């Protein structure tokens, strides 16, 4: 994967997250902000999830209250380089815990 392909795929990821949060109709207040290559999700309780792109490594990094995760693209899925879990699974787990209600991005 070259840098432009990586950015295109990361942009798609950001857009999917942003669209799901724009359509969010849960009880919790969840805000999303993109600044440069960093996407910040802020929850009503003040906690945050930070997602950023690591261009030199062609990775997406996810920082949550539960920990930090690094994802490589394998096929058409972003996969955690430690646990083998998908980006979407870990993001949904963290967002659900931090929002206090079920949050889905799929």
Swiss-Prot record:
Any Pfam family matching the protein: Frataxin_Cyay
GO biological process: iron-sulfur cluster assembly
PROSITE patterns: FRATAXIN_1, FRATAXIN_2
InterPro entries, alphabetized: CyaY, Frataxin/CyaY, Frataxin/CyaY_sf, Frataxin_CS
GO molecular function: ferric iron binding; ferrous iron binding
Tree of life domain: Bacteria
The protein's name in its UniProt record: Iron-sulfur cluster assembly protein CyaY
Gene (name only): cyaY
